[in-house]
Amino acid sequence: MMRIALFLITNLAVMLVFGLVLSLTGIQSSSVQGLMIMAGLFGFGGAFVSLLMSKWMALRSVGGEVIEQPRNETERWLVETVRTQSQQAGIAMPQVAIYHAPDINAFATGARRDASLVAVSTGLLQNMSRDEAEAVIAHEISHIANGDMVTMTLVQGIVNTFVIFVSRLIAQVVSGFLSGNRDEGESSNGNPLVYFAVATVLELVFGILASIITMWFSRYREFHADAGSAKLVGREKMIAALQRLKTSYEPQEESSMMAFCINGKSKSFSELFMSHPPLDKRIEALRSGDYLK
């Protein structure tokens, strides 16, 4: 209920900001051109703001702590492993962080390849062998080297723009029709309450459907990150790491972080809405070498 309330409040706030921006620029939001500009600004704007704040948001969501100076042998090994692999991948040394969680997991994020972050859970450090942990770290380094965070942001921006544009275009037609504004030359949002209600419902529906696209891309990049890890540390180490993930607790990270973690949630009514492929499929892809070519 709280999430729905926050969504409605956010949606109303966005619409108010839309109106202010468009009135200041003289663009009519009821025109197709104005609606497209509005959708693009906020569709890509929100995605890129999230990207720019990704390191701060990620650390805050998991309670992660950046290693400024290694305090023990495990932290020294972790930092040196990240340093070695980042040099092999041709990227700048990422920040390294640890967060407390019982599940075996890790993630990478950051707005640029040369200003990134790699974080691992205490569950990973406690339950994986060094070879397995090396493979997981190499997987995250591969995400950074492949520029996955930026590409994911572009995909999300396109999806956001489409959802906002189509939802509000249909809402204009419906609210105008119900308000009696059927003249071809008339441009109006009709009843504001009807417009808001229809736009909100459609954004929810189209947002769920559009997530199929973003989740497909997320699964696709996981296969390539697995292959990147295999190239850095060896195929058998990566396969062993994925097999170890089968014994892990269900990931505890927030849903907003799942696409950036190596271990995604397995409980979903459909694979279409999963950010990660099933572990068995990832292992089979490595064994067949489909993404190593």
UniProtKB/Swiss-Prot annotation:
Essential cofactor(s): Zn(2+)
Keyword match Ion transport: no
Entries under Gene3D superfamilies matching the protein: Metalloproteases ('zincins'), catalytic domain
Compartments it resides in: Cell inner membrane
Keyword Glycoprotein: no
Cited NCBIfam families: PRK05457.1 (NF003965)
Protein name: Protease HtpX
